[in-house]
Design a protein with these regions (language model features):
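Short loop/turn microsegments at loop-to-beta-strand junctions
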Residues: 29, 54, 140-142
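Structural microenvironment flanking redox-active thiols in thiol-disulfide oxidoreductases
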Residues: 69-110, 121
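Aromatic-flanked redox-active Cys/Sec active sites in thiol-based oxidoreductases
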Residues: 58-64, 94
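A short beta-strand-turn-helix
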Residues: 32-54
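Hydrophobic beta-strand anchors of alpha/beta hydrolase catalytic cores
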Residues: 56-57, 89
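Thiol-/selenol-based redox modules, centered on thioredoxin-like
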Residues: 137-163
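Short, internal strand/loop/helix patches
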Residues: 90, 104-140
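N-proximal helix/coil linker or "cap" segments that precede and/or mark the start of modular domains
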Residues: 5, 9-36
């Protein structure tokens, strides 16, 4: 399951081939965005999060859809493992902050933050969901595991939330 792969990548520092344009070994683009944790809005800053330890950025298409809800539930269940590794997990989508505040409580179970994936973030992380050559306005289901140094150590991109 994907959560075990991500946990292993954090623990072992493994590099895994990526299907996204940001390759393993690249520096993760820094950003700030609106986010929600346990229903409370705050400003997420990747630089600040990395100062505390590794970060798992996971992009998902849309809050409260079947796949995204199940993926959020899986991350929430795996949070003890991520916390044991000192990792921060944050989910990003292009949903508005009010939707994310609800999602952070109802589906993320107050266990991790979710943030607004601005157009700039979507472009710099190369996570626009494109179908038939057209940008859908959603993000792809892509996860980046970022070491505390800012280096991307794993990329996983697959619309099937079960991977």
């Amino acid at each position: 399951m994907r959560k075990l792969v991500l946990t292993a990548a954090l623990a072992l520092g493994l590099a895994v081939p990526a299907s996204a344009d940001l390759p393993t070994g690249a520096q993760a683009p820094l950003f700030t965005t609106q986010a929600a944790l346990a229903g409370q809005e705050y400003g997420f800053n990747l630089r600040s999060a990395l100062a505390k330890g590794p970060v798992v950025l996971y992009f998902y298409p849309k809050a409260f859809t079947k796949g995204c809800t199940l993926e959020a539930n899986a991350f929430a269940e795996a949070m003890p493992e991520f916390k044991a590794l000192g990792a921060t997990v944050v989910g990003l989508s292009n949903d508005d902050i009010e939707t994310l505040k609800r999602f952070s409580t109802e589906e993320c179970r107050d266990a991790f933050a979710v943030g607004v994936a601005s157009r700039r973030i979507v472009e710099t992380y190369d996570v626009a969901l494109v179908r038939n050559g057209q940008d859908t306005g959603f993000t792809s289901r892509t996860s980046y595991v970022i070491a505390q140094s800012g280096e991307i150590v794993m990329v996983h991109s697959d619309l099937d939330y079960r991977d």
